[in-house]
Amino acid sequence: MSEPYEELLSGEWHLRLGPGERHERICARLHEIMLASVANYPATKLLPPRMKIPLNQYHTIRPDLALVTSANNRLWLAVEIVSADDHRADTVIKKQIYEDMKVPRLWMVDPRYDNVEVYFANEYGLVLGAILAGDEILTEKLLPEFQLTVRELFLA
């Protein structure tokens, strides 16, 4: 198990439990595939897992995976791997923060059900675009080289 860490969510510090072994394997696999996918896209940077990202004075988040634009470090893809014993912070609180901050993409990777919820921002907020499982392929149109079957992700 990894070390606990803190996030500033809606002006309050929240102590988050250290992710478990499966969580960390999934995170490492996702980073490995994503790193290869962004290598040819200098406009995008992949941040280290759970790097502190201050959004404003009320929110400092630490997503499991984050892609930012190289020009201004603006977060454009956040990935949260949901922990069964600490899921509310990711699935409710942080999801609302991502929506309020108009983050263009959010993936909720849920090892409890071996699925991935893919959200896209529009003028009304975050919209659920797909719930992927099994042999369905997780892709991102802004990163044409990124393709990963959900089954492969959860075998990590």
Q: Residues of each region from the PLM?
A:
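Gly/Pro/Ser/Thr-rich low-complexity, intrinsically disordered segments predominantly at protein N-termini
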Residues: 1-156
